[in-house]
């Protein structure tokens, strides 16, 4: 099964496998050492399958209600149509309501992930209230970038957790990371003081195609086929993106990004509270997923 980015096939010679970590057999220091060494932790089946299924079905039901999924909606097949704008006055309000589904929050802000990050930090952790739920239809992918410019305004002690709610085979656009990128000095120098909301003349997106980027750095593009309940954790300078969803069965990819930090660290008010306003202050309306499934995405 091919991996594509912007319709371009990734040469198999450039692809590598993500190293798996068994969190139940790892000490806190071993988890931190793996993050330091690889720039990520790949955790299989970390979330209870029943919790994942419940959240997925609840999200899919909402997408079906705006005519974006075919029946049976639990299969997650895109209809290629949408009544989202006809039925909802505000895209941001709609996506905020989807992102607030109780079964979803039991996963994203539940005890399992909180405990994982408490082990990583060596102290109690807390997840952002503002989450990045992504429903990804055919032809879409996330451009390569690192997260520092979005989330490190108040504290540098932030990690991203990417959770799969559907089967994410190679044709459905799994996450990838550039091998060793968390140690690329030029990346750290460029993004250490960058804030995408303040420095509007710059972009967080790395314009170089991942194929060229990996070749120039003699690196690999690391990925895997993800199962529901799998998670990938990585730091703010790990260069990553997603492959293109080009699945012939028209099934969407449902994943979610959650950020965690130590509870003792100061909190960025953009991402915490009852109604956080997100990176730019536009709330959930700023997210690509606030757009109907059949509409193109932006990049920043």
Regions found by a protein language model. Give the residues of each.
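A short beta-loop-beta micro-motif enriched in histidine and acidic residues
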Residues: 113, 122, 146-158, 219, ...
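Non-heme Fe(II)/2-oxoglutarate
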Residues: 2-20, 65, 69-73, 189-193, ...
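Active-site region of the double-stranded beta-helix
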Residues: 123-126, 148, 153, 163-174, ...
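Short, conserved beta-strand element in jelly-roll/cupin
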Residues: 152-170, 225-228, 233, 259-263
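Double-stranded beta-helix
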Residues: 170-239
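Non-heme Fe(II)-dependent double-stranded beta-helix
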Residues: 2-37, 44-144, 150
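Short edge-strand/loop segments of extracellular domains
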Residues: 136, 178-185, 257-265
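Phosphate/oxyanion-binding loops and surfaces in catalytic or ligand/nucleic-acid-binding neighborhoods
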Residues: 62-66, 123, 168, 184, ...
């Amino acid at each position: 099964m091919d991996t594509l980015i912007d319709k371009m096939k990734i040469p198999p010679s450039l692809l590598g496998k993500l190293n798996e970590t068994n969190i139940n057999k790892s000490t806190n220091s071993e988890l931190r050492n793996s993050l330091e060494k690889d720039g990520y932790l790949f955790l299989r089946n970390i979330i209870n399958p029943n919790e994942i299924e419940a959240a997925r079905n609840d999200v899919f039901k909402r997408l079906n209600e705006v005519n974006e999924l075919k029946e049976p909606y639990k299969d997650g097949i895109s209809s290629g149509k949408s009544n989202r704008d006809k039925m909802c006055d505000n895209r941001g309000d709609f996506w905020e309501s989807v992102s607030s589904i109780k079964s979803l929050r039991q996963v994203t802000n539940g005890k399992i992930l909180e405990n994982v990050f408490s082990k990583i930090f060596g102290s109690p952790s807390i997840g952002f209230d503002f989450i990045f739920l992504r429903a990804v239809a055919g032809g879409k992918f996330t451009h390569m970038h690192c997260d520092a410019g979005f989330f490190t305004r108040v504290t540098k002690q932030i990690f991203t957790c990417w959770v799969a709610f559907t089967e994410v085979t190679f044709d459905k656009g799994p996450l990838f990371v550039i091998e060793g990128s968390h140690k690329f000095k030029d990346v750290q120098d460029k993004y250490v003081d960058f804030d995408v909301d303040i420095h509007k003349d710059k972009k967080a997106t790395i314009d170089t195609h991942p194929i060229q980027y990996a070749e120039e750095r003699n690196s690999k593009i690391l990925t895997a086929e993800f199962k529901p309940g799998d998670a990938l954790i990585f730091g703010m300078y790990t260069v990553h993106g997603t492959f293109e969803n080009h699945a012939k069965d028209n099934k969407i990819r449902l994943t979610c990004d959650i950020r965690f930090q130590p509870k003792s660290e100061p909190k960025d008010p953009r991402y915490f509270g009852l109604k956080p306003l997100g990176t730019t202050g536009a709330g959930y309306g700023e997210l690509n997923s606030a757009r109907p499934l059949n509409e193109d995405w932006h990049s920043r």
